[in-house]
């Protein structure tokens, strides 16, 4: 599985050199033909390599032109999709109709569209003008349904996802409209969605460890065992999956779309934490994929004390790099057994759903990686 970030305003762009005019419901919309062709090539290459492709659609807060009709402006980086105006709503319909046509066929199939980033934290990641949660989710649910209808009209295999972070019952700004708890956001969103006709949403969840810096998620003190837990991390991810199964239904799927583990306490611990988290996701039938957030960490991560990458800022491979390469192979459990001493387990089969035979039908690794040493 591969998750890509795509900028809406780079695709819907009348200032490009090679324009493609798309007519939708009597209006014309201008797309960047070269950009779209490049994205199609990118998707096709991943598909040819055997990967499913998922795309996060992001709208910059300073988007201009036709894309700007969908933007609220303000916030830090990204805007939520503005469907409260006729122009914004119609533009979003046109955009998703176009994207479904371009990326709904077998050669260029986007298997999932993730709308925005961490929508429960609108000020930081999905600004919507400081609205109440109810008004915000009215808008977001409308955008979600438009995307759902557009993609499903072309491909029954494509899904749409809401993006959420780990603040399950934690309201960061204490009742303001800049941040909302994940659970209230999910509940309100699903209520709004059902009110206009039931469809099955999917969730792109970010399962970082508590505080982001400390890698050992099994020690997360705020991650409890019940639905009243403050946060949900890999320690208690089953709280999320069980809640979604009961609230939305067993057909809803959860993608762990972004998480990474710090290497500041040693590369062996980082590798062990990743293997542990991956196996938890593998053993949970409601989790469809686990996406590691960083290949090579950027300077902005390092500046905050986040040394998350499979490779460091200079491109040097950390121990987690080889763990990542073998994690879903036939030899997975054997190649990672030396990492157990860095966890609170004595065997990976202590994880629910993991058996010695779990990976027996998977591909065998081509390169014979030695067991990771301490």
PLM feature spans:
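Short, electropositive alpha-helical surface patch
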Residues: 64-82, 170-187, 264-278
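Residues embedded in well-ordered beta-strands within globular domains across many folds
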Residues: 1-3, 114, 204, 255, ...
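Noncatalytic carbohydrate-binding groove/subsite architecture in carbohydrate-active enzymes
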Residues: 44, 92-93, 111, 135-268
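Helix N-terminus capping/helix-initiation residues
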Residues: 30-32, 85, 132, 178-182, ...
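Beta-sheet entry/capping signal
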Residues: 52-54, 159, 253-254, 288-291
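Surface-exposed alpha-helical segments enriched in charged/polar residues
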Residues: 37-48, 97, 101, 145, ...
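Aromatic-rich peripheral "rim/lid" segments of glycoside hydrolase catalytic domains that contact
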Residues: 13, 17-22, 71-74, 81, ...
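Substrate-binding cleft and catalytic face of glycoside hydrolase catalytic domains
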Residues: 1-172, 210-211, 297-302
């Amino acid at each position: 599985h591969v998750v890509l970030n795509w900028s809406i305003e780079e695709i819907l762009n009348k200032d490009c050199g090679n324009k493609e005019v798309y007519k939708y419901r009597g209006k014309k919309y201008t797309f960047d033909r070269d950009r779209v062709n490049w994205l199609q090539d990118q998707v096709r290459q991943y598909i040819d390599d055997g990967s499913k492709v998922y795309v996060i659609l992001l709208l910059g807060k300073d988007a201009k032109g036709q894309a700007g009709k969908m933007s609220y402006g303000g916030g830090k980086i990204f805007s939520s999709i503005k469907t409260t105006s006729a122009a914004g709503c119609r533009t979003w319909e046109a955009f998703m109709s176009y994207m479904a046509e371009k990326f709904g066929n077998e050669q260029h199939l986007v298997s999932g569209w993730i709308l925005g980033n961490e929508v429960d934290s609108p000020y930081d990641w999905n600004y919507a003008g400081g609205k109440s949660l109810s008004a915000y989710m009215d808008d977001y649910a409308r955008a979600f349904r438009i995307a759902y209808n557009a993609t499903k009209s072309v491909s029954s295999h494509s899904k749409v996802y809401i993006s959420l972070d780990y603040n399950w019952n934690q309201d960061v700004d204490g009742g303001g409209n800049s941040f909302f708890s994940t659970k209230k956001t999910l509940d309100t969103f699903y209520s709004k969605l059902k009110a206009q006709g039931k469809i099955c949403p999917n969730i792109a969840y970010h399962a970082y460890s508590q505080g982001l810096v400390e890698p050992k998620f099994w020690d997360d003190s705020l991650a409890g065992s019940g639905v009243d837990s403050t946060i949900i991390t890999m320690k208690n991810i089953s709280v999320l999956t069980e809640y979604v199964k009961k609230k939305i239904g067993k057909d809803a799927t959860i993608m762990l779309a972004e998480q990474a583990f710090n290497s500041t306490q040693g590369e062996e611990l980082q590798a062990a934490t990743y293997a542990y988290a991956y196996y938890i996701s593998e053993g949970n039938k409601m989790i469809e994929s686990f996406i590691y957030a960083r290949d090579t960490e950027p300077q902005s991560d390092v500046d905050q004390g986040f040394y998350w990458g499979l490779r460091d800022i200079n491109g040097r491979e950390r121990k987690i790099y080889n763990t990542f390469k073998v994690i879903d192979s036939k030899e997975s459990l054997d190649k990672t057994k030396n990492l157990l001493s860095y966890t609170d387990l004595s065997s990976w089969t202590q994880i629910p759903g993991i058996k010695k035979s779990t990976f027996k039908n998977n591909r065998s690794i081509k390169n014979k990686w030695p067991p990771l040493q301490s």
